[in-house]
From Swiss-Prot:
The keyword RNA-binding does not apply. Pfam families: SDH_C, Shikimate_DH, Shikimate_dh_N. This is Shikimate dehydrogenase (NADP(+)). One of its GO terms (molecular function) is shikimate 3-dehydrogenase (NADP+) activity. Belongs to the shikimate dehydrogenase family. InterPro entries: Aminoacid_DH-like_N_sf, NAD(P)-bd_dom_sf, SDH_C, Shikimate_DH, Shikimate_DH-bd_N, Shikimate_DH_fam, Shikm_DH/Glu-tRNA_Rdtase. Keywords: Amino-acid biosynthesis, Aromatic amino acid biosynthesis, NADP, Oxidoreductase. Homodimer. Gene3D superfamilies: Leucine Dehydrogenase, chain A, domain 1 (3.40.50.10860), NAD(P)-binding Rossmann-like Domain (3.40.50.720). It comes from Methylobacillus flagellatus (strain ATCC 51484 / DSM 6875 / VKM B-1610 / KT).
Length: 270
């Protein structure tokens, strides 16, 4: 039976095995999907071991997406755009790297939340692997403007310099330079939720009818509490993004596109 896994640190909380099992059952695919916690200095060794054991592919989560990018012997255009990889496929000794985070996020916002991004003012918090993975697909959705904010502004500026913004106004700044700014969509791509940490964000970020979106899932994060206190019209966690990016990875591996709605509903009800 074909075997897959998710690799991260930490990874105990991951719902990816449940999601892929549901997709497999729904589509009649025979596969096994597990989770592997890699030591912080042991990602490459773990991937090599799984590849040698005959695994067909792995998903990659925090904090290994940049290492996965470097490890891949072949990269898709969207992986190159992201500079980070969350889906590896093992084929005839080669390691194919792709990134499904961005398409997962955009599909969740546009389809599941029925919230348009075109013409909107978007704030992306963070400049790590999660933010890298979603920047280009967000720009492809044609927002009016997109601001990347990060504690260290040079990381945000470097990230902005690596993409083609098209018609979107793109800028980068530190968290301390967000005062007096207003946005229609604020996306938290930092790992602050993992550490129960509140970001140093000013009051007044949310425009009327604004969406606050945290890529973390499983519980209310400090960012989501902040958004509620600040009066954000809609607040969403990253469960929909998780399911949508998993569906794209499943399609890459199996060439069958699963229906995400029943899987999301089951996870919400659990």
């Amino acid at each position: 039976m074909d075997r897959y896994a998710v690799i991260g640190h930490p990874v105990e909380h991951s719902k990816s095995p449940l999601i892929h099992a549901a997709f497999a059952q729904q589509t009649g695919q025979q596969l096994e999907y597990g989770k592997v916690q890699a030591p912080l200095d042991g990602f490459v060794a773990i991937v090599t071991d799984l590849q040698e054991k005959g695994y067909r592919g792995v998903n990659v989560t925090v904090p290994f997406k940049f290492e996965a990018y470097s490890l891949a012997t072949e990269l898709t255009p969207r992986a190159r755009d992201a500079g980070a990889v969350n889906t590896l496929t093992f084929t005839d000794g080669a390691i194919h790297g792709d990134n499904t985070d961005g398409v997962g996020l955009v599909r969740d916002i546009l389809q599941n939340l029925a919230f348009t991004l075109a013409g909107k003012r978007v704030l992306l918090l963070g400049a790590g692997g999660a933010a890298e993975g979603v920047l280009a697909p967000l720009l492809e959705a044609s927002p009016l403007s997109l601001c990347i904010a990060n504690r260290t502004v040079d990381k945000a500026e470097a990230m902005a310099a690596r993409v083609r913004p098209g018609q979107t106004s793109l800028d980068a700044r530190g968290f301390d330079a967000l005062a007096d700014q207003e946005f229609d969509v604020v996306i938290n791509a930092t790992s602050s939720g993992l550490h129960n940490e509140r970001l140093p964000l000013p009051s007044g970020l949310f425009a009327a009818d604004a969406l606050a979106y945290d890529m973390m899932y499983g519980r209310e994060t400090p960012f989501m509490r902040y958004a509620r206190e600040e009066g954000a019209s809609r607040i969403a966690d990253g469960l929909g993004m998780l399911v949508e990016q998993a569906a794209e990875a499943f399609y890459i591996w199996r060439r069958v596109r699963p229906d995400t709605a029943p899987v999301m509903a089951a996870l919400r009800a659990a």
